Amino acid sequence: MAHSKTRTNDGKITYPPGVKEISDKISKEEMVRRLKMVVKTFMDMDQDSEEEKELYLNLALHLASDFFLKHPDKDVRLLVACCLADIFRIYAPEAPYTSPDKLKDIFMFITRQLKGLEDTKSPQFNRYFYLLENIAWVKSYNICFELEDSNEIFTQLYRTLFSVINNGHNQKVHMHMVDLMSSIICEGDTVSQELLDTVLVNLVPAHKNLNKQAYDLAKALLKRTAQAIEPYITNFFNQVLMLGKTSISDLSEHVFDLILELYNIDSHLLLSVLPQLEFKLKSNDNEERLQVVKLLAKMFGAKDSELASQNKPLWQCYLGRFNDIHVPIRLECVKFASHCLMNHPDLAKDLTEYLKVRSHDPEEAIRHDVIVSIVTAAKKDILLVNDHLLNFVRERTLDKRWRVRKEAMMGLAQIYKKYSLQSAAGKDAAKQISWVKDKLLHIYYQNSIDDRLLVERIFAQYMVPHNLETTERMKCLYYLYATLDLNAVKALNEMWKCQNLLRHQVKDLLDLIKQPKTDASVKAIFSKVMVITRNLPDPGKAQDFMKKFTQVLEDDEKIRKQLEALVSPTCSCKQAEGCVREITKKLGNPKQPTNPFLEMIKFLLERIAPVHIDTESISALIKQVNKSIDGTADDEDEGVPTDQAIRAGLELLKVLSFTHPISFHSAETFESLLACLKMDDEKVAEAALQIFKNTGSKIEEDFPHIRSALLPVLHHKSKKGPPRQAKYAIHCIHAIFSSKETQFAQIFEPLHKSLDPSNLEHLITPLVTIGHIALLAPDQFAAPLKSLVATFIVKDLLMNDRLPGKKTTKLWVPDEEVSPETMVKIQAIKMMVRWLLGMKNNHSKSGTSTLRLLTTILHSDGDLTEQGKISKPDMSRLRLAAGSAIVKLAQEPCYHEIITLEQYQLCALAINDECYQVRQVFAQKLHKGLSRLRLPLEYMAICALCAKDPVKERRAHARQCLVKNITVRREYLKQHAAVSEKLLSLLPEYVVPYTIHLLAHDPDYVKVQDIEQLKDVKECLWFVLEILMAKNENNSHAFIRKMVENIKQTKDAQGPDDTKMNEKLYTVCDVAMNIIMSKSTTYSLESPKDPVLPARFFTQPDKNFSNTKNYLPPEMKSFFTPGKPKTANVLGAVNKPLSSAGKQSQTKSSRMETVSNASSSSNPSSPGRIKGRLDSSEMDHSENEDYTMSSPLPGKKSDKREDPDLSELEKPRSRKKAPVTDPEEKLGMDDLTKLVQEQKPKGSQRGRKRGRTASDSDEQQWPEEKRHKEELLENEDEQNSPPKKGKRGRPPKPLGGGTSKEEPTMKTSKKGNKKKLVPPVVDDDEEEERQIGNTEHKSKSKQHRTSKRAQQRAESPETSAVESTQSTPQKGRGRPSKAPSPSQPPKKIRVGRSKQVATKENDSSEEMDVLQASSPVSDDTTQEGAEEEDISVGNVRRRSSKRERR
């Protein structure tokens, strides 16, 4: 070394001036004192003091002796360490110590002294700090690089520094430590794994949480040395991740935590590590993939992370894990989504597609977390989620699992409240989620009580928060109601109705409890408890809890009084909240935090507590309406036109007047309503009248000034007002005034005298008014009414056609285009019906003669006089009026008894009327009467005829009505076990004999053994039986079989001696029996009870006669294939909020696009149904399949497609499909199959007349066949000759002995049913007008397209020729048959393709738009739609030559 030359040989130690020798002979205190002086000397020296350096060299060596390095006293050691640090500074760059071992001892000694830094409160701390500062500044430890044991020294130093750092240290300490450690990494040749571990261990979460300062120190060190240390970090991860050498470090198990920390510190540290993660994401080890996914979720989702944009391959690879096979991995990905959406909105687009798939994940937890992720992001900022993401939440509100549905509904509710109610993000955001309110209320259509209760809770807490101040709450409700769509409004009205009903049930229960206990009262209480239980979740538990609650009410008078106050009509909202609080407080038990009993009672109280509406609320609502009327409301700001707001406000008040009539009892409210009566807007005045009718019972006593102001207005309205206002004015007088007889007389007399048949315009209101007076006060005007009906109504109005109708080929026109004379005739028919319903007896035989008149109208197709003056649209209206009138009268027992079977059968044919709107409205009237249990069961049999309807929408609606009516009756029987005497009129299975009888008398069923006609019969029977047989409750299959067997032992009561008629009856029985046998495995069991057959329809069974003959032709056997009926789809959809019946579709070419879940087919041989089918007729392969039956030419299948000119006759109809098909067709169908691949495995095509034997090869025939038909249609289109007049009833079958071979191709479109919401019941007239309005709206879209189609059908020479030679003549529905003229050219026999048929085609093509994206399919699709169209010709009952332009 440099100093060796000047070393004294004697080794004498020179001490600084004033310092005596330091040895073990002196005391510790003295030693410390002397060492301090030495420290001072070294501190003051610098590197340039060569003399001093030489002078004190031996002292430097002496201080490094073991005596000092191992001295027991810490103060001595500290001072020596300070000296040594200065010595390294002074003698740098060469240290005075030559021995490597000595150097190691010295540095290990200094390292040990650094532990003293830990105690910042120590008096010696400054000296420790000096020591640290000195060695850091001088980089003294760098001397150790040359030592073999350098790694041990550095590792010890790092460990020491990381262990001593704490929050007592200031920034300088931290800085010096970083300087010291970074110099070792940056200037050294290598970083050992052990040294790296001492740094990285501080990043592991457990250590990080224990010593935050050590973590910060490691972080600062890594940032400072990033470039130098990166290769060593890369090597470490490479060894662990890629080579699996976990033994190289104790930190191997924390690699993923470390990667995250290192990435957060400096992403450059991991430049070479991240690609390794991509490899790990594809590992076969589930746990390993999960760890990597968790890690990357944090890295991608971190607030300022740019990893996704910097490393796109890794991001794409990560997104792939959303579809991982391992559930926890998918779950992790979904949870990550919300952080990613919140912190990186730019990645939302990438995530959307993956979240879409996961929102349909089979795992409930994943679907649930998709909702949570999207809603969490949306609640932070609605702009973070796009419409697609919100739609995923929307879809999940219909999830099969309650937990997912609940999360989705609550999520949407919270989003709605924040952005729509509180306008947290302005109007644009509110607009973006404007659909939420409608969607949430639509869920009220679900059958599940849990869903409905949640909707009620959401409405009360999020949509119209009950804790708002009254005025604010009513304003909120007012504008909500004005902006809801029609279905949501219906749902909200239904909600209030249900709550009101439950409130009354609880009130009845309380009344029963107060009565003295008897067996009868106990039974009544139990019955009432059962009814209330059905309105609560989990009926099993609810029943027990309700029994317990009933006991509490009997025992605890205070709770009973609170509940009485709660259900009282005068209960205010504030009072209601108080009552609920008191009852729950009394029932609660502090020792039992989770109390299921209390929870159930809370559900009940929530449903019955009037938290929104009381007298004060109604008053506030009326004021809000008045503001809109005066123009002082902020309607425009709320995005509602003033007229719409006023109308909606009155509608809202009208609904509330049903559920909360007492709340309207205030002078202010009635005065405002009186002002509304005088407004020009008819709807507003109409609603005001209805409100008076519902709420005015106390006006006469309590508000005389209102009474005197109201009476003249009512008189005026009933005489001169619009018809609907006249109707409600009469009902108001009846409800409000005690002197109603006088008032009625004052109105009736002048109206009666002024009736003038020549003044048609002014006849409608008087007829309406007189009709309603007759309904409400039949005895008061019995004589004048009878003569009025006989002379004026029948002779002057109905039997007279004063003006010729407009010539038109349309079958239906809007109200404003209907001739005034027809409008008067319709009101005349209604007036007669009201008169009869008021009388409720047939003593004067008025009912009999009226029914005769109505059936004559039906028989003459609406032209009662048969003079041919009435236009076709007017005839349609009159047929509808007559059919509806019979259905209305049938609801009154005294008239039901006198309706003959012939009249009933003729009325039934209205459901197959040639005019779509007649069928639609008649079906709705029928459903309304049935669902209220007013119509006898035989009227449900009429629904079977809907199987013949060519329009899917009508079939779907009929199917839903059937399901609903069967369910209603079964529920009623469950609830009223004691009504066994009514079993014959209520048990749905008893519809089977009526259906069999009706089908045996169907005018289309002419030839007993005709295969095509029998197939029709089978379709109609299956339409009813499929739903009845869906569940084999109480062995009902055997019961139905027994019923059918019994019918075969009787005769037709309508013509017991008519052999042909009885043979038809038995043949229909055999069809039914074959369906039952093919669809049930339990039909052969013993029937639970012996069925009773209706005596009006069947004679008593002949004990001596055993009818075991099989009446079916042998060929029919092949049309019955086994398979269980599946109606789950239909059952699930009955109450779904689908588009309302008759909803107009988007383009004029489409008539009835039903964007709802596909309902099943009505085919006994149908293998099942496609769930969630695409809206395309193209998907209904099997819908067009029944023309594959009974082929006389089974061998010609392949020829058919190759020669497009083959006649229809040659098209194969055999059920047995050829196994081989063209590759070309196969291709087309494969494309098609892709679209339904999810459904196909379930075997659920919607084939109506096809068994399981119907293989794909058959489906693959259709594209070519469609092309052929399409070409024919195009050719016919060009000819475009006018259609020839046809008959009403079903399409005539041309003359000739044989059966038409084309007929099978004419019956298919009836098959594809789509679910539709059964329309809610409304006021009769109101409902009819609304229905007619809807149908008009719709018909416009159809009129234009029909003519060409009708002509096309009329002009196909090949098909007509075939028919003319092979069809059976047939009677038109509703009147005697008129045979086609022999001279008439055969090609025109098929003329009147009905409107429904033509528009069916349009419908199909509209539905096809959905599939346009996939071009290989779409061409065939539209052809398939067209073919379906063609095929359905045979199903239209009534026909007209010129309906095409309707």
Swiss-Prot record:
Its main location: nucleus. Residues 1172-1184, 1196-1212, 1223-1241, 1263-1272 have a biased composition (Basic and acidic residues). Regulator of sister chromatid cohesion in mitosis which may stabilize cohesin complex association with chromatin. May couple sister chromatid cohesion during mitosis to DNA replication. Cohesion ensures that chromosome partitioning is accurate in both meiotic and mitotic cells and plays an important role in DNA repair. Plays a role in androgen-induced proliferative arrest in prostate cells. CDD domains: PDS5. Residues 1137-1155, 1353-1370 have a biased composition (Polar residues). The gene is Pds5b. Residues 1243-1252, 1308-1317, 1339-1351, 1436-1446 have a biased composition (Basic residues). Keywords: Acetylation, Cell cycle, Cell division, Mitosis, Nucleus, Phosphoprotein, Repeat. One of its GO terms (biological process) is cell division. Signal peptide: none annotated. Belongs to the PDS5 family. Expressed in prostate. Residues 1247-1259, 1285-1297, 1370-1382 bind DNA. It comes from Mus musculus (Mouse). Residues 1421-1431 have a biased composition (Acidic residues). One of its GO terms (cellular component) is nucleus. The modification Phosphothreonine is found at residues 1253, 1365, 1368. It is found in: Nucleus. The modification Phosphoserine is found at residues 1140, 1162, 1166, 1176, 1182, 1191, 1255, 1257, 1281, 1356, 1364, 1367, 1381, 1415, 1418. Interacts with the cohesin complex. Interacts with RAD21; the interaction is direct. Interacts with WAPL (via FGF motifs) or CDCA5 (via the FGF motif); the interaction is direct, cohesin-dependent and competitive. HEAT repeats lie at residues 383-419. Residues 1137-1446 are annotated as: Disordered. The modification N6-acetyllysine is found at residue 1136. This is Sister chromatid cohesion protein PDS5 homolog B. Residues 1156-1167 have a biased composition (Low complexity). It comes from the Eukaryota. One of its GO terms (molecular function) is DNA binding.
